[in-house]
Amino acid sequence: MQDFLKGLPKAELHLHIEGSLEPELMFEIGRRNGVALPFANVEEVRAAYEFNNLQEFLDIYYQGAQVLLHEQDFYDMTFAYLQRCREQNVIHAEMFFDPQTHTDRGVDIGVVIRGLTRAMEDAEIQWGQSSKLILCFLRHLSEDAAIETLRQALPYKQHFVGVGLDSSEVGHPPEKFQRVFEQAQNAGLLTVAHAGEEGPPEYIWQALDLLKVKRIDHGVRCIEDAALMQRLIDEQIPLTVCPLSNIKLCVFDSMSEHNILRLLEKGLKVTVNSDDPAYFGGYMNENFIAMQEALPMSKEQAAQLARNSFEASFLTSEEKARLLARLDQYLQNH
């Protein structure tokens, strides 16, 4: 079963590119740029990756991002993640990036976007990797700051397909960002938002009704609201669920308690994702394997989760059909 899961063609739709920065690369880039980290070595960094909640993780995540200053830094980080996709049969990836984490440190948004997109282009040329970018606003900052970020980003609009909302959820409801999401939609961008991870089901309603999102990132707390569940089923609104992340941040106490397969069996369009894999102990295959070991998960369920990931993507219908054909071919042979 593990070999089946490793070989399974899949798409990842919930991945923060800054959260893929492995400690080794963090140190390498830090040395290159003369940025001192508050850790003596890689082992110390890994030891610090024990979190009790989302905020404890975010504090370390923003520290790690301090090393990223130049276009090449963003290139190296992105290319390393896309190489991991190649190894794990993630044949399409939609990556979040957090421009405010960098522009607030004086890094130009163009430097960020050029570094990311150059890596994406090289991965496509070298092995046919499919990928897209989604710009995320940090919800612990003001909506005015998000509006300014969108303004700075729009000259590069051809490089990203949508906008999202991430960072500290509780106390920062989606309604806080209604205007900037309207502006993004008017500019032709798709919308997604983190909701219902630590925040209540009400935040999922707001994301759907006020931000008009096409996907909910996380969304696992929808199970507390029957009417919301029904709507997510009826409208087939995808949930980009991150199992290992949820355990690492104590959203669930253990993988055996995770509700992803219950949501799947009820007819919700759930997908498996790694969120911040360098911090949460696993990329896509590690997430699938952890689920299979703890829940357990059948081949049919794994195949449906993979199918959902392509159907929920922001690819064109032709591109979806091409990647789904690769999945079907794999399933026929396995």
Swiss-Prot record:
It comes from the Bacteria. The keyword Iron does not apply. Its cofactor is Zn(2+). Zn(2+) binds at H14, H16, H194, D275. The record marks H218 as: Important for catalytic activity. Substrate binds at D276. This is Adenine deaminase.
